[in-house]
């Protein structure tokens, strides 16, 4: 190292130039517009295509939509869906068991796309938790309850997204 360079380094470190450069950068961003969202109090808008908690839908007459074709179970890459079906007296087939293990689910939306009758949908609900592993194992009754509770929102999101499908 040359003498000039070492003197320059000594003066630079003695005058704390790196510290002042850092302080200038901090000052520059301190007064700029904040982009951080304080989550529980503030929420950002969600897209109509947001994929959150699953729900099973019903027809207007109260009958569940799922026809037990098992396409959603077949297309699920995480193998998170389990379906068992039974044949009714009128010859139609309906599910006797429809379970989704949310600890396995990757929320890809393939189940929703594969469903020919729009029975399984992903809602805008993302604030749910489980204290035990079994709490994130949703049964048919739980999924139908979610669908019944949020049917108006689900229908509005489906209508908003219809022109893009």
Swiss-Prot record:
Gene3D superfamilies: 3.30.70.3270. [4Fe-4S] cluster 2 binds at residues 76, 105, 108, 111. The keyword Translocase applies. GO terms for cellular component: plasma membrane. Residues 57-86, 96-125 form the 4Fe-4S ferredoxin-type domain. Its main location: membrane. Its cofactor is [4Fe-4S] cluster. It is a peripheral membrane protein. Its EC number is 7.1.1.-. PROSITE patterns: 4FE4S_FER_1 (PS00198), 4FE4S_FER_2 (PS51379). The keyword Disulfide bond does not apply. [4Fe-4S] cluster 1 binds at residues 66, 69, 72, 115. One of its GO terms (biological process) is aerobic respiration. It catalyses: a quinone + NADH + 5 H(+)(in) = a quinol + NAD(+) + 4 H(+)(out). One of its GO terms (molecular function) is 4 iron, 4 sulfur cluster binding. It is found in: Cell inner membrane. Keywords: 4Fe-4S, Cell inner membrane, Cell membrane, Iron, Iron-sulfur, Membrane, Metal-binding, NAD, Quinone, Repeat, Translocase, Ubiquinone. InterPro entries: 4Fe4S_Fe-S-bd, 4Fe4S_Fe_S_CS, NADH_quinone_OxRdtase_chainI. Binds 2 [4Fe-4S] clusters per subunit. NDH-1 shuttles electrons from NADH, via FMN and iron-sulfur (Fe-S) centers, to quinones in the respiratory chain. The immediate electron acceptor for the enzyme in this species is believed to be ubiquinone. Couples the redox reaction to proton translocation (for every two electrons transferred, four hydrogen ions are translocated across the cytoplasmic membrane), and thus conserves the redox energy in a proton gradient. NDH-1 is composed of 14 different subunits. Subunits NuoA, H, J, K, L, M, N constitute the membrane sector of the complex. Belongs to the complex I 23 kDa subunit family. This is NADH-quinone oxidoreductase subunit I. It comes from Polaromonas sp. (strain JS666 / ATCC BAA-500).
């Amino acid at each position: 190292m040359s003498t000039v360079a070492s003197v320059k380094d000594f003066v630079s470190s003695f005058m704390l130039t790196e510290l002042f450069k850092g302080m200038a950068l901090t000052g520059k961003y301190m007064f700029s517009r904040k982009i951080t969202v304080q989550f529980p109090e503030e929420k950002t808008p969600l897209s109509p295509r947001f994929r959150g908690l699953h729900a099973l839908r019903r027809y207007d007459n109260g009958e569940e939509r799922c026809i037990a074709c098992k396409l959603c179970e077949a297309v699920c890459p995480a193998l998170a869906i389990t379906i068992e079906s039974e044949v009714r007296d009128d010859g139609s087939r309906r599910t006797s068991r429809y379970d989704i293990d949310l600890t396995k689910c990757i929320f890809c939306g393939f189940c929703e796309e594969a469903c020919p009758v729009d029975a399984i949908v992903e809602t805008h609900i993302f604030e749910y938790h489980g204290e035990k592993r079994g709490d994130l194992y949703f049964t048919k009754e739980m999924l139908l309850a979610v669908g019944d509770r949020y049917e108006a929102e689900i229908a509005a999101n489906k209508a908003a997204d219809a022109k893009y499908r």
